[in-house]
Amino acid sequence: MQIYEYPRETRIDGKCVLALGFFDGVHIAHRDLIETARKIAEKKRLPLGIFTFTGDVKGGAERIYSDREKNRIFESLGADFTVYADFAAIKDLTPEEFVEKILVSSLGCVISVAGFNFRFGRGASGDAESLKALMARAGGEAVIKSEITHGGETVSSTRIRNLLTSGRMKEATSLLGAPYYIIGRVEHGNKTGRTLGFPTVNLPMSEGGVTLRRGVYRSAVPIGEKIYHGITNIGTCPTFDERSVHSETYILDFEGDIYGEEICIYLLDFMREEIAFSTPSDLKMQINIDKNRAIKENGDITWQELGLK
């Protein structure tokens, strides 16, 4: 999948179908929208693009996923390219300028697909109905997706963000369409886990990302062609008086050196709060309890359940 940054880069080589939105979380309503756009693109034999935004679009709200994490999902959903528009550079355009200058002239969009609550243009003055009218005036078409609910409530990024901050991972998974994950390159830690007999992989937490509930999670870690079960701690390791929040994952039944490699940690379920133990021996005993519980609760995890392949 190709990545473009607007207005620094524009894609002008032919016509396309564009899925429009901020897509924070790429939840089940977003996935439904992108799948609609994909089917249209396939039928019209046109490339499928995602048009989204960078910058403070949501008034300082914590992001569910970083752009890099979203790219991985976009590609798995069939996108040929993604355009990241600098929100600060385009926020003062009129709705007419947004459609005619960016979507149609610069990007070659002939069919756009957006959600019922999509807003665009100066002061968010453009809405779904004006998108349909402006695309038609430009010789194109806009398809508007209806609201999607789950459990009687609208599926929204705000709702998912609240679930993640409270550790309700299974509920978040049902709205996201796949387990929430973090991605990064494995860093060297202080080797504490190794000295306890539980070597861990350490990933930095994304700046500006959603604040996850601190504690221990049951997790899944794809490495190569295999999915491993894991136990992930999100927090500061209070037993050893560390300060920065990071993630440490003990990967069950894995032996290998993956320092410097990029991996994904899927958080399946919240197990317990982070605890400051009196001694390392007490911590080791608890990790064994966590490990045995994880083994008992883990079933076979498929690539499809992780939203992959």
Stretches with model-predicted labels:
Residues 189-309:
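Phosphate/ribose-recognition catalytic cores of enzymes acting on nucleotide-derived substrates
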